[in-house]
A protein has these predicted regions:
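Active-site ExK catalytic segment of metal-dependent nucleases
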Residues: 136-148
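Residues at the C-termini of beta-strands that transition into short coil/loop
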Residues: 49, 73-75, 121, 144, ...
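A structural signal for isolated positions on well-ordered beta-strands in alpha/beta enzyme cores
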Residues: 118, 139, 166-167
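Accessory nucleic acid-recognition modules appended to NTPase machines
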Residues: 1-128, 132-135
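An exposure/low-complexity boundary signal
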Residues: 131, 202-203
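Conserved acidic residues
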Residues: 129, 138, 163
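Short acidic, glycine/proline-enriched helix-loop-strand junctions
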Residues: 118, 176-202
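Catalytic cores of nucleic-acid endonucleases
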Residues: 145-187
Length: 203
């Protein structure tokens, strides 16, 4: 129970990685292994594993100890954070958790289409929220609550080949062939997730 109640706090850290010490001082990840497994099987939480630098397929976690937990119900995220759900959309500038809220939303939509969750971290602060494998091709997903920059995608491309990247944000649908970047609004992610799952993804 204490694990479940602290998930949004885990995501609100700078690294977002699961940190057992945040729940109980001196505790280890293995102390929560059974709880995480049970909550994942019950679809109460969704587990995303870290990938580093150069990625090989099929996608496999670089380490079982580096992962993140997302809440399986986006409404529960709002409840745990104590922030009105409407503020995540209407007043996002004043809501420091809005970026995490949207990441949690995308994670749930990917899980709904039976994708396994992975995220990428470079040696610096570079990070991409989700990496999807479809038809032996990589599709990095960058989740932005605003316009944001593409620094992480540029660093990712230095180490990995990908079909094209997908930026999920509030912006309108569009495609930049030079950057191989498809931009989609948040409401479109269920359709993209399905196409990736079916292996029918096209621009």
């Amino acid at each position: 129970r204490v694990l479940f109640q602290n998930i949004y706090r885990e995501l609100n850290k700078e690294s977002k990685n699961f940190s057992p010490g945040l729940i109980e001082e001196k505790s280890k990840t293995r102390d929560y292994a059974t709880s995480i497994q049970w909550l994942t099987m019950a679809h109460v939480v969704n587990q995303s594993f870290q990938l580093k630098e150069h990625i090989t397929m099929p996608l496999m976690p670089d380490s079982e100890s580096n992962f993140r937990l997302f809440l399986g119900d986006i409404g529960m995220f709002s409840y745990q954070s104590g922030i009105n759900a409407a503020s995540f959309v209407s007043n996002e500038r004043d809501n420091t958790l809005s970026g995490i809220f949207f990441e949690n939303f995308v994670a749930n939509e990917l899980i709904a289409k039976e994708h396994k969750l992975f995220y990428w971290r470079g040696r610096t602060s570079a990070e991409l929220e989700f990496i999807i494998e479809s038809n032996n091709k990589l599709y990095p997903l960058d989740v932005k609550k605003g316009r944001g920059t593409l620094n992480s995608l540029e660093k990712f491309s230095n180490h990995n080949k990908f079909e094209y990247a997908i930026k999920v944000s509030k912006n309108n649908y569009g495609y930049n062939p030079e950057q191989r970047l498809l931009t989609i609004p948040f409401y479109f992610i269920p359709f993209i997730a399905k196409d990736l799952a079916d292996g029918t993804m096209t621009i």
